[in-house]
UniProtKB/Swiss-Prot annotation:
This is Coenzyme A disulfide reductase. Its EC number is 1.8.1.14. NADP(+) binds at residues 151-166. It catalyses: NADP(+) + 2 CoA = CoA-disulfide + NADPH + H(+). The gene is cdr. InterPro entries: CoA_disulphide_reductase, CoA_disulphide_reductase_staph, FAD-bd_OxRdtase, FAD/NAD-bd_sf, FAD/NAD-binding_dom, FAD/NAD-linked_Rdtase_dimer_sf, Pyr_nucl-diS_OxRdtase_dimer. It comes from Staphylococcus aureus (strain bovine RF122 / ET3-1). Catalyzes specifically the NADPH-dependent reduction of coenzyme A disulfide. Substrate binds at residues 15, 19, 22, 39, 42, 71, 299, 427. One of its GO terms (molecular function) is flavin adenine dinucleotide binding. NCBIfam families: CoA_CoA_reduc, PRK13512.1.
Length: 438
């Protein structure tokens, strides 16, 4: 009976194991997870802190016991894979509770160890990062135990923005700092102004081009020379792949520690796959490498690997489109396609339109700004971005499908919109992009 070992039990690993079991009732499947919890919703964590998700239990899909009862898959939490011997097809495992080490053999190995939050490196009792439910619980307990009021949020990516909004809605007083003036980097820089407007509207302090120099108790010294006091600091300064344990194997890593995979999600070593935040692949619509550490890619890759292991080698990963979205107070920001700094590799043109998200005469209308970049050589869409209070997700998802099917910008005129006054226009913003590009 084949033995399948999975490293990591969150989005990619647990989903892949579950899909394998759906297709294969016989194989022995075991998952090693270095942390306390499995199958939790990373994306829910800021909303747990903000009490939008009323109970943290809703962010936890399975316990190991429930997973085994439902699927006959063994999950061992607090078990960290610390080395891979790909020649012998074994992994070395550390039981983090007992410090016992042992080896586990495998016929197929699936790597989904995810990523860890970067830290600023200060030794302080008031600094926290947010990456898993343990972090969430620690933040929650600290807030309650210390009657936290003033919170410093460091970083301006989507996690930091979500955390800040949820702290504010919880009734706390957050301040945002970021080391540069480039915020929410997945968006076009000039489309991010509503982020600052939303902060200003609520009188939430923020400083760009600012960094922490020292932390002494609750006293924070900044690069600008300011000295301020905070009850708590939450750091959102990026992540790094959990690939240290892979370095001793023959598995190829890129210079950032990610694992390049082929379209079957295979590494360069036979019988070893990589999925989720650890893996890097390519775009679907253009010939460029891509790393997109978001939930969709982990779930899609999990299903493909399950099919591959079950014997269906016709299903392959066709690449990322990089579709992403974030809510910040009243606004939604979304983009799809190559990143802004990758556009320079193309001869491109940009076309944009700003108009109401639905019919102007219908109540509650607000502007939606939609922008599309296209390749001048074949007129295919390279990237799209949108910002507004409503209708952003619909337009970006439609453009994602257009890019998936390699439509030209001109073909957007043919998009047949589901029109009624509360939802759109007879000629939607997407249609208008096509007309303006002609």
């Amino acid at each position: 009976m084949p033995k399948i070992v999975v490293v990591g039990a969150v989005a990619g690993g647990a989903t892949c194991a579950s899909q394998i079991r759906r297709l294969d009732k016989e194989s022995d499947i075991i998952i090693f997870e270095k942390d306390r919890d499995m199958s939790f919703a990373n994306c829910a964590l800021p909303y747990v802190i903000g009490e939008v998700v009323e109970d943290r239990k809703y962010a936890l899909a399975y316990t190991p016991e429930k997973f085994y009862d439902r699927k006959q898959i063994t999950v061992k939490t607090y078990h960290e894979v610390i080395a891979i011997n790909d020649e012998r097809q074994t992994v070395s495992v550390l039981n983090r509770k007992t410090n016992e080490q042992f080896e586990e053999s495998y016929d197929k190995l699936i790597l989904s160890p995810g990523a860890s939050a970067n830290s600023l490196g200060f030794e302080s009792d008031i600094t926290f990062t947010l990456r898993n439910l343990e972090d969430t619980d620690a933040i929650e307990q600290f807030i309650k135990a210390n009657q936290v009021d003033k919170v410093l949020v460091v970083g301006a990516g989507y996690v930091s923005l979500e955390v800040l909004e949820n702290l504010y809605k919880r009734g706390l007083h957050p301040t945002l700092i970021h080391r540069s003036d480039k915020i929410n980097k997945l968006m076009d820089a000039d489309m991010n102004q509503p982020i600052l407007d939303e902060l200003d509207k609520r009188e939430i302090p923020y400083r760009l081009n600012e960094e922490i120099v020292a932390i002494n108790g609750n006293e924070i010294t900044f690069k600008s020379g300011r000295v301020e006091h905070y009850d708590m600091i939450i750091e959102g300064v990026g992540t790094h792949p959990n690939s240290k344990f892979i370095e001793s194997s023959n598995i190829k890593l890129d210079r950032k520690g990610f694992i390049p995979v082929n379209d079957k999600l295979e590494t360069n070593v036979p019988n070893i796959y990589a999925i989720g935040d650890i893996a890097t692949s390519h775009y679907r619509h253009v010939d460029l490498p891509a790393s997109v550490p978001l939930a969709w890619g982990a779930h899609r890759a999990a299903s493909i690997v399950a099919e591959q292991i079950a014997g269906n080698d016709t299903i392959e990963f066709k690449g990322f489109l990089g579709n992403n979205i974030v809510k910040f107070f009243d606004y939604t920001f979304a983009s799809v396609g190559v990143k802004p700094n990758e556009l320079k590799q193309f001869d491109y043109k940009m076309v944009e339109v700003t108009q109401g998200a639905h019919a102007n005469y219908y109540p509650g209308n607000s502007p939606l700004h939609l922008r599309v970049y296209y390749d001048t050589s074949n007129r295919q869409i390279l990237r799209a971005a949108a910002v507004g209070k409503e209708g952003v997700d619909k337009r970006i998802d439609v453009l994602s499908m257009a890019m998936m099917n390699q439509l030209t910008v001109d073909e957007l005129t043919e998009f047949e919109v589901a029109y009624a006054p509360p939802y759109s226009h007879p000629k939607d913003l997407i249609n208008m992009i096509g007309y303006k590009a002609k």
